[in-house]
Swiss-Prot record:
Its main location: virion. Interacts with capping enzyme RAP94/OPG109, the two large RNA polymerase subunits RPO147/OPG105 and RPO132/OPG151, the two early transcription factor subunits OPG185 and OPG133, one of the capping enzyme subunits OPG113, the nucleoside triphosphate phosphohydrolase OPG123, two core proteins OPG129 and OPG138, and a virion protein OPG064. One of its GO terms (cellular component) is host cell nucleus. Pfam families: DUF678. Belongs to the orthopoxvirus OPG146 family. The keyword Hydrolase does not apply. It comes from Monkeypox virus. It is found in: Virion; Host cytoplasm; Host nucleus. This is Protein OPG146. InterPro entries: Poxvirus_A19 (IPR007769). The keyword Nucleus does not apply. Keywords: Host cytoplasm, Host nucleus, Phosphoprotein, Virion. Plays a role in the maturation of immature virions to infectious particles. May also participate in viral transcription. Residues 1-20 are annotated as: Disordered.
Length: 77
């Protein structure tokens, strides 16, 4: 048996694509619904706040998808 006959019955494996994780300095939180980036408190002076939709209390609305964002401790109350 030569090597070509042995390979004919075997499934060929596809190589997984290499993924690289880019660790940005501007790591910021993302919206859990649409994954758009949210403003960090340290960047508050650099960003125009006209697009932030405040709802009631500590709840914000994501300007990209409209979902409501609130603190985790607000879920208990």
């Amino acid at each position: 048996m030569d090597s070509t006959n042995m390979r004919s019955g075997m499934k060929s494996r596809k190589k997984k694509p290499k993924t690289t994780v880019i660790d940005d300095d501007d790591d910021c939180m993302t919206c859990s619904a649409c994954q758009s980036k949210l403003v960090k408190i340290s960047d508050i002076t650099k960003v125009s706040l006209d697009y932030i939709n405040t709802m009631r209390g500590n709840t914000l609305a994501c300007s990209a998808c409209g979902s409501s964002l609130k603190l985790l401790n607000d879920f208990a109350s």
